Amino acid sequence: MLISLNWLKQYVDIKESIDEIANALTMIGQEVEAIDIQGKDLDNVVIGQIVEFDKHPNSDRLTLLKVNVGGEEPLQIICGAKNHKLNDKVVVAKIGAVLPGNFKIKKSKIRDVESYGMLCSEAELGFTKESEGIIILPEDAPIGTEYREYMNLNDVIFELEITPNRPDCLSHIGIAREVAAYYNRKVKYPMIEITETIESINTMVKVDIEDKDRCKRYMGRVIKNVKVQESPDWLKSRIRAMGLNPINNIVDITNFVMFEYNQPMHAFDLDKLEGNITIRAAKKNEEITTLDGVDRVLKNGELVIADDEKAIAIAGVIGGQNTQIDNETKNIFVEVAYFTPENIRKTSRELGIFTDSAYRNERGMDVENLSNVMARAVSLIAEVAGGDVLSEVIDKYVEKPQRAEISLNLEKLNKFIGKNLTYDEVGKILTHLDIELKPLGEGTMLLIPPSYRADLTRPADIYEEVIRMYGFDNIEAKIPVMSIESGEENINFKMPRIVRGILKELGLNEVINYSFIPKFTKELFNFGDEVIEIKNPLSEDMAIMRPTLLYSLITNIRDNINRNQTDLKLFEISKTFKNLGAEKDGLAIEDLKVGIILSGREDKNLWNQSKTDYNFYDLKGYLEFLLERLNVTKYSLTRLENSNFHPGASAEIKIGEDIIGVFGELHPNLVNYFGIKREKLFFAELNLTKLLKYIKIKVNYESISKYPEVLRDLAITLDRDILVGDMIKEIKKKVALIEKIDIFDVYSGDKIDKDKKSVAMSIILRDKNRTLTDGDIDTAMNTILELIKDKYNGEIRK
């Protein structure tokens, strides 16, 4: 948003320097992005008067002039324009002037006659691209005065970054309010005077709002017998300061008022209207040629202003050529309206029309200020274009908005901003912001923001206003007074990170999948009624919420194998979902789980070791390592009955009666279903939510024993259905000297009975306090052998 300092000074007294004003604007939230000092290109450009007028002696097309510029002697200047005469007041660029485009004025000789300057046109001064002749000034223009001073071009333009919640600041009066509030000054609003005729507007035109959802207020006035012409210099100066080119006095006034009050408006040629005006939705494929010369077809019911025959404007966005103001216009209809912001935003983007009008309307206007804006525009049009203002105003007001009422507690405000402001201090700040105050007692007040501040709806908004105007620089920085107590990180948040770190140490790669899986998996994996189905799934592949990570990890393996990546060990940590059923009112439970899947061969890329296929014990080892690192030791393994797993190579992990996980080789039929050939898959899933209560947070450390270990190997024959893990736990309970037992071989085959299996293990014995004697070792081994024989019917292999 461009703001002219000269224009701003019309509404508020400003004594501060440019830098001080820029800093103040930034501190109150209207950030200054750039400052443009205008008139720099108009040094040595002054007002002069033609005091002698002769033809050039050597050219019929040139004139030889003497021009009084306030010096001791008139300047001799040669001119090629045709629109000047004796005694005209003109704009003179003296020797040394540098005009826009780096055009330097020097002493020159034209057709053997010297010239000491140049008479300027608007194009040569950079005001327009083309001009028909030089600038002719009014008779009262003071000779010798700098042209930029005369035209009020000694201006400073601030470019501001206005936030979307402050559309009121897209105007000079809006910024004047902000500056006045900051410096505790008053805003000087424009004086408005209108002389009306006896003739009523109701005899000329009527207005009907057909689409009341998108147009909440529409006002109109008629001015007859206007004279459309070039705008006066003061008006052109204001329009140019905003980066626009003047068009004519009527259009320029509508733009002037928009930049003054931030209220877009439009003027129609009344004689080009056919009947009355209706605000309605566009008809299917209705056509309109807009002011930018583009033929547009309206297909989506855009809101339009229409007469009885045609659309004459796209409401709040752009006018139509069929009713535009031109030099022949005599009677005009002036509109100002409130269109809903969401409608303007939608229309502007659909049609690709981004005008100043649309930019403002889509941010929301002050609907209660329309009558004031209309009066201001009509009074200015009558001033610069003459004409007769018809009596009465068309004002169709569909719905008056309800202003917010905010209860403000002084104690809470002071606590928030870190100050101890009094009731009167806060009241003064808010009053300068046009916020109405009603005391409620006990340090509380009821606040009603002005109609142009729709962004103020709650106490926090008021806190911001008080801080802005009190000044951020006036609030001292303080170190918060607080007691800091160290605390432990919540294990619920810490758990996934710990598990992720452990599995990455083991060389597993993490994957992330969607929480939704296809509906057919319900039958494939025998999920039963525990599945939660999505009523409106994005696709068939995302129809149910997964109760297990199994499907996702299998598809990860399949997709990698299809890309010739077969040696894989993956894991995923994510939530699963389970329906508790009708007994629990259809409630669902979420469990955090970790899934692990192995495929192919272990990557031992060493010269002295060959790759080996992953097996049941690799997976079991990963789980044991994970549980050990989590300090979970009191768990047991039992045979798993699950159709998704190989019946002879799967187990479930239990702590007491809680099943915290399952693992094993996936059933070959399931693997084949996914088109995975010649590969065994090993899958494990741990319920981390259940596991949480068994994790030991505190770890006890002990020193490494300085006494030597004793290693004994043992091979035994057992019944095939005996779980070796349970047997090892029982042995450790009986023999305190056992430090570790490792299984290094399991065999079942032709060399032993078909109902038997051979298990070979290494047993490490150690005492922490002394060296073991032969008697200690023999006693321990005999106890182990007796337990294996008596309880598990085992035999020692020799």
Curated annotation (Swiss-Prot):
Co-factor remark: Binds 2 magnesium ions per tetramer.
Binding annotation for Mg(2+): D455, D461, E464, E465
Gene Ontology molecular function: ATP binding; magnesium ion binding; phenylalanine-tRNA ligase activity; tRNA binding
Essential cofactor(s): Mg(2+)
Keywords for this protein: Aminoacyl-tRNA synthetase, ATP-binding, Cytoplasm, Ligase, Magnesium, Metal-binding, Nucleotide-binding, Protein biosynthesis, RNA-binding, tRNA-binding
GO terms classed as biological process: phenylalanyl-tRNA aminoacylation
One Gene Ontology cellular component annotation held by this UniProt entry: phenylalanine-tRNA ligase complex
Catalyses which reaction(s): tRNA(Phe) + L-phenylalanine + ATP = L-phenylalanyl-tRNA(Phe) + AMP + diphosphate + H(+)
Subcellular location: Cytoplasm
Domain FDX-ACB: residue ranges: 705-797
InterPro entries per UniProt: aa-tRNA-synth_II/BPL/LPL, B3/B4_tRNA-bd, DNA-bd_dom_put_sf, Fdx_antiC-bd, Fdx_antiC-bd_sf, NA-bd_OB-fold, Phe-tRNA-ligase_IIc_bsu, Phe-tRNA-ligase_IIc_bsu_bact
Domain tRNA-binding: 39-148
Similarity remark: Belongs to the phenylalanyl-tRNA synthetase beta subunit family. Type 1 subfamily.
Quaternary context: Tetramer of two alpha and two beta subunits.
Protein name: Phenylalanine--tRNA ligase beta subunit
Species of provenance: Fusobacterium nucleatum subsp. nucleatum (strain ATCC 25586 / DSM 15643 / BCRC 10681 / CIP 101130 / JCM 8532 / KCTC 2640 / LMG 13131 / VPI 4355)
